[in-house]
Each structure stands twice: as structure tokens, then as C-alpha cells.
């Protein structure tokens, strides 16, 4: 397997991507009104115009997952599958999202007069930006929900990530 995290396309064949695992996502909820929505249906904002938050079966998570169990899995985004909204392995759209390192920045931390400064190096994600984390989920869910066209008002990293993942999934973008 390649050592460069950007070239780990073979990871799509590992158990994180192909195993059928339970999902502990129970529903979506408006934090403002408490209104609940099914997690496996297309939604927009709540009636109050607020984003919908993911809710989980936390007792189920505690019983099924442990730090040791998660640590034993391949180090990629999909090691947390049971906590992600994508339920069926065939709906996963992946470009090889590896875990990204936290880099110590002692000189900059000292220059800023603070304590230890750590920076998460998300530039190692397949599209070179932290935007890949959210858009891999958005496109995977779009695929699961049968969406065939996606649009996003951006000319930056989010647009590049959407284009990359949607192309991988065969979803048209505007």
C-alpha cells in the first residue's frame, strides 16, 4: 500500500468501507424547536430556518464501540462508520481520506506568547482542504438518497471538494 496518504485509493476495499455495520444515528433534530426528522430522507433547514443536528443512540454506541476497537481499525475517516450517516457500504464515496496529523508549532506558540500550539494538517486530505471532511459525507448521503445533481455557491476549496467527490460518485455538479 502506498505510504503517501493522497494515494490510498485501495483503502476503499478495506473493512472500514465494505463491512456492513450498524448506524447509531437515530434522527435529525432542530436544536431550536426540538422538531425531529428521519435521518435517511432529504431535508433542508428546519421550519424555524435552523440547521438539523444529528442525534445518536448513545447507549448503543457505548455498548458497541470502545477506544481499543476504534484504534484497531485502519486509520481513516471511515473507522467511525457507526457514527456517520451513511448506512450502506455501497453508498460510500471515498478518495482515501486518511487521518491527518496534529503538528506541534513551538516557535510560533512562543512568538504568540501562548502555551503549546498545535495545528491539524488537513492539507493531506485528498482535495487538499478540510472541506473534504464535510463534503465526503454530503456526497455519500446524496448518493444514498438518489440525488443526481448537486450545486454549491463557492469558488474555493468547498467547490473543489464537491467536484472531486461528486465526480467519483457519478453525480453532476453546477
What is the role of each PLM region?
Residues 2, 6-174:
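PLP-dependent amino-acid enzyme catalytic core
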Amino acid at each position: 500500500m502506498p505510504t503517501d496518504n493522497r494515494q490510498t485509493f485501495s483503502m476503499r476495499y478495506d473493512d472500514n468501507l465494505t463491512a456492513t455495520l450498524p448506524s447509531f444515528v437515530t434522527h435529525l433534530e432542530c436544536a431550536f424547536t426540538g422538531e425531529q426528522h428521519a435521518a435517511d430522507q432529504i431535508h433542508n433547514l428546519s421550519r424555524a430556518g435552523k440547521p438539523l443536528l444529528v442525534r445518536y443512540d448513545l447507549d448503543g454506541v457505548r455498548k458497541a464501540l470502545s477506544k481499543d476497537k476504534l484504534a484497531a481499525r485502519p486509520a481513516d475517516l471511515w473507522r467511525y462508520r457507526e457514527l456517520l450517516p451513511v448506512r450502506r457500504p455501497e453508498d460510500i464515496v471515498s478518495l482515501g481520506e486518511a487521518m491527518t496529523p496534529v503538528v506541534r508549532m513551538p516557535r510560533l506558540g512562543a512568538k504568540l506568547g501562548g502555551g503549546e500550539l498545535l495545528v491539524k494538517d488537513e492539507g493531506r486530505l485528498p482535495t487538499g482542504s478540510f472541506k473534504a471532511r464535510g463534503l465526503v459525507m454530503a456526497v455519500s448521503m446524496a448518493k444514498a438518497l438518489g440525488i443526481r445533481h448537486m450545486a454549491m455557491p463557492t469558488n474555493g476549496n468547498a467547490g473543489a471538494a464537491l467536484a472531486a467527490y461528486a465526480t467519483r460518485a457519478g453525480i453532476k455538479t453546477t
